[in-house]
Amino acid sequence: MISTTSTRSQMEATPYEVAQAALIKWGAFMLSIYVIYLLVFPLTPTIYREDHVLEIEQMLRHGRKEFAKFYVLGLFGLFYAYWRVLRTVHSLSREDPEAAKSLRVWVLGVGILCAITLIGLYPITALDVVLYVVRARLWALYDASPMLAWPANYPQDPYIRFAGEYIKEPSPYGPLWELIAQIPIRLGILDIAGGVIAMKVITLISYIAMAVLIGWYARQETSRYRVSGLTAMTFFALNPLVLIQAIGNGHNDMVMLALITLGLVLWQRDRWAAAAFAITLAALIKISGLILMPLFGVAMLAAAPDWRTRILRGLGMASIFIFTAAAAYRVTGPFPEVFLGAQHALFDRWGYTPAYATLVVAEEIFQYEGAVKEVIANAAHLLFILYYVYLLIRVAQRKLTLIQAGFFAYLSQLLLGTTFRIWYPLWLIPFAALELNSRTYWRTFLFSITAELSILMYLIVWRWKLDTWDWGLNGPLKPYWHYWTVMTLTTAPWVFGIPLLGPLLLKWKNSRKFNTSLWL
């Protein structure tokens, strides 16, 4: 009798109830993994135990190596649960669009619960958030602009030791971020753990704002894929890369991306001046936000009905950008010195990209000398510029929308840049969420997985296995068995190859389905 009743209730469940139950089940699964991560890697007291910041490998090497397996399995579990939820909500959106709207609050609630849990997580795979606090203290306590000052110049500060390898570098971030970051310090949050939590709260607020913008206010650029606000918001809000990197590691990219999303939503509503202001603010958080500005300018001019309107809007946008940027940078220091940190970050850092892999092959294997580094860097930059000009032309011709061109621009920056960090694929998400199709979904999804797992390769796999592997040390690859050579030539193909080739294989398998729907 009980079995019959249960079967009947399942048969009578509405699509909304089925989707809600799946969300609760998989949401609880995701939350449980984040809670376990929190228990193993708590922010406090971990941050007080050492005189420097710790990487995940350093936290596991003594007596806890077995947990590395669980960490990896946990990541796969998180991405699997995320994929299951995304499929469920997309199915509901197609079957009952009105009911799907009611599930947005539930999805956002699950995301916020996971995010709040991760506020207490030690930043295990990226330590930038600790640097935010150190640099904010320079300004708030010592009246030294982090855009100019080195942490090394203030040895009296008890937390300067956390600056690590960046102790003799000015801030690479924009002035707006440095203005925001010092607010918690000026409010009296002087402890290092409290400062880290405050920075994560800032990213949490940005995360919620971006989720609301995507779920309630944005619209899809192309209607034929039948993607709802619920699906788009789920794509963003439950992505493990977003939650771990933006909240768990507290990256200020989240603030930049929320402002970019605001700018795109305003653009969709023909509020070009407000959109220009929001995108300018995004570029003043991180210089990478600047990539969108020329595309926005061309899209705005192309959409204007006549030349008089184009001239007026062009002058208006230029005024908004120039005066806002000049005012923000002027507060942080004199020109051009305030740009030194960003310049160093853009042009002097290398690592784990196709360009850097090319450099490693040239220098380590073929023993090229001289200006090979400059040649490769210039070639990569030139390729990006040429492709970017192509995108500008396509936008001017109205063959690409701003959102489509933005996705391609940031994707090309990931591929052609000279440096890569595991949270950089976050840059794709605002554009993918507002133009969600098989191509943008799979590129972003696969990039999220390969990036999140890549740090384990060059921290754990190398240090625990490959560094002491007898075949590598004494075999035919002995002359090349060095950290940068081995890790770059294994990590770069993994991180970039899978997101590039994966969608092509799906398209080859079923081109019609790939091109006409969101194939999950």
Indicate residue ranges for each PLM-predicted region.
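Transmembrane helical bundles and short interhelical boundary loops of multi-pass, membrane-embedded
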Residues: 2-74, 302, 312, 317, ...
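Loop-to-helix entry region of an early transmembrane alpha helix in multi-pass inner-membrane enzymes
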Residues: 67-72, 175, 179, 189-209, ...
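Short hydrophobic alpha-helices at membrane interfaces in multi-pass membrane enzymes
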Residues: 226, 230, 261, 266-281, ...
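Specific aromatic-rich, kink-prone transmembrane helix
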Residues: 209-213, 244, 255-271, 410
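Intramembrane catalytic core of multi-pass membrane enzymes that act on lipidic substrates
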Residues: 99-200, 204
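Transmembrane-helix motifs of polytopic, lipid-linked glycan transferases
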Residues: 28, 76-88, 197-223, 257-258, ...
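Transmembrane-helix signature of polytopic, membrane-embedded enzymes
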Residues: 101-107, 214-239
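Short helix- or helix-capping micro-motifs
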Residues: 111, 232-237, 279, 283
